């Protein structure tokens, strides 16, 4: 798929007012499409739950690093894969809290949360200074602010293939989601990625992404605010 129409610049807009999304209420869910129509090559089968989740994470790596506001739809962060016609197009849809018990779906949740936290924490993902190539099997986004550069790159094939990060410069780049680093000696040289492989590189060491889910959050201290304060002694 070609993602560039999700970039506000592609429409000639000067402000980041384009709300982009990968799922909505009036179309089949992307997880459903992958599960039903996904491609297969040898042992790489996108219709399997684990691989479907990998493809969703790959897509989210680009959705959430395109600067501008985003929308997510009900249980998208857990890979909701029921058809829009189940039971009918305008019927109420099943609320599937049980999805969170799935290790694979929980992984999608954690990566989605980490990507959102990353874009909210680091200014490079809010910049106006970025270029992109989003219309092929090798996709990339290059973002820059004065003190940080970021390059997002992924292989959308179901086979190994070359990707073209077009790093902003040579030198050491840090992989935010693995904690590893690479030394780039040729900024325009291709890299060979496995099917569905993706990376978010920065030229400043931001540390390694923290993948935290609801299990971890619920054991952390909570703050509760009461209103009105003072009260009449009864809290409902």
Segments and roles (model prediction):
Residues 148-150, 198, 232-234:
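Intrinsic-disorder/low-complexity, polar/charged segments enriched in Ser/Thr/Lys/Arg/Asp/Glu/Gln
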Residues 215-236:
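Surface-exposed, proline-anchored Ser/Thr-rich loop/turn motifs
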Residues 51-55, 103-111, 229:
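Soluble or luminal CAZymes and related metallo-dependent hydrolases
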Residues 134-137, 185-189, 231-233:
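Ser/Thr- and Asn-enriched, surface-exposed coil loops between beta-strands
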